C-alpha cells in the first residue's frame, strides 16, 4: 500500500498465513497470479505517512473481522475439443471458470471429507470445504460477473474459535478486483457493486474518515470497541483511500 491505499490496525501482532481450525478442502492449484493476495499492512508500521499525507485525507473505515481470507473469481473460459466431446454425453459447456480460494490456494469444489482437530484448545470438525460451502450459500458463482474477483472474510462457528459469535458460515466482501484492468474498485464503487449483485459487504463504520487528524495512540484507542455482534471485541479497523 504505497501511499496508504490500504492501512489496517488489528490487535494481533502477527497475521497467520492460514488460520488454524479451518478445513480448506482439496487444493486445486496455486492462488491465481493475476489477482493480488489480501495481505494488508498494519498502521503501526506506517507512521511515516503522518508526515507524507495531508491530515484531511479521507478514507473508508470498515470493521476488521476475525476469520479467514476468501477470494472468489470468474474468468472467461473457451471450451476445449474434449469439453465439446463430453457435451454429447451430458457434460455442460461453460464459457467461464469460477474459482474459490483460501489465502494461498485455489480449492477444488469436491472436498467433502470430515476432519476433527484442536483449535486453540477447542475441538473443531468440518465435513467439507467451508470456502465452497460459503460460496454456494451466497450463490456467488451466479452473481459474480465475468472478469471480477471478490475478496472478503469468511467467519463461522469453528473458525478462529468463533470470535465473531455467529451461528453459521458467513462471508463479507472487503475488496472487488477488476481482472481486466488490474485495479481494485474504489470504496464507493465496491459498495455499489456488492449492493447491485446482492453480495454481503463488510460492515462500514465511516465512508469519509480522516485518520491523520488523530495521533497514532488516539487512533488505536478509536478502533477499540464492539465488533459486528454484541459482546464481541473488534479486531480493529481497515482504512482505504476513497479514490484508490
Regions found by a protein language model. Give the residues of each.
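Core nucleotide-handling region used for phosphoryl-transfer chemistry
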Residues: 1-244
Amino acid at each position: 500500500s504505497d501511499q496508504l491505499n490500504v492501512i489496517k490496525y488489528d490487535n494481533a501482532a502477527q497475521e497467520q498465513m492460514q488460520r488454524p481450525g479451518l478445513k480448506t478442502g482439496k487444493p486445486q492449484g496455486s492462488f491465481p497470479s493475476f489477482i493480488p493476495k489480501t495481505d494488508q499492512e498494519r498502521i503501526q508500521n506506517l507512521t511515516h505517512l503522518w508526515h507524507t499525507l495531508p491530515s484531511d485525507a479521507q478514507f473508508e473505515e470498515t470493521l476488521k473481522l476475525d476469520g479467514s481470507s476468501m477470494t472468489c473469481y470468474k474468468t472467461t473460459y473457451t471450451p476445449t475439443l474434449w469439453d465439446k466431446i463430453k457435451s454429447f454425453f451430458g457434460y455442460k459447456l461453460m464459457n467461464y471458470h469460477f474459482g474459490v480460494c483460501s489465502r494461498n490456494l485455489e480449492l477444488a469444489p469436491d472436498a467433502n471429507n470430515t476432519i476433527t482437530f484442536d483449535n486453540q484448545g477447542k475441538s473443531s470438525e468440518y465435513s467439507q470445504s467451508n470456502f465452497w460451502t460459503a460460496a454456494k450459500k451466497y450463490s456467488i458463482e451466479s452473481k459474480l460477473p465475468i472478469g471480477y474477483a471478490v475478496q472478503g472474510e469468511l467467519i463461522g462457528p469453528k473458525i478462529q474459535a468463533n470470535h465473531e459469535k455467529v451461528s453459521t458460515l458467513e462471508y463479507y466482501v472487503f475488496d472487488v478486483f477488476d481482472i481486466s484492468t488490474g485495479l481494485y474498485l474504489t470504496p464507493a464503487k465496491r459498495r455499489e457493486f456488492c449492493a447491485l449483485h446482492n453480495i454481503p459487504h463488510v460492515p462500514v463504520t465511516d465512508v469519509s474518515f480522516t485518520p491523520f487528524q488523530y495521533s497514532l495512540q488516539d487512533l488505536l484507542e478509536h478502533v477499540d470497541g464492539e465488533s459486528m455482534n454484541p459482546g464481541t471485541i473488534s479486531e480493529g479497523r481497515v482504512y482505504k483511500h476513497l479514490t484508490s
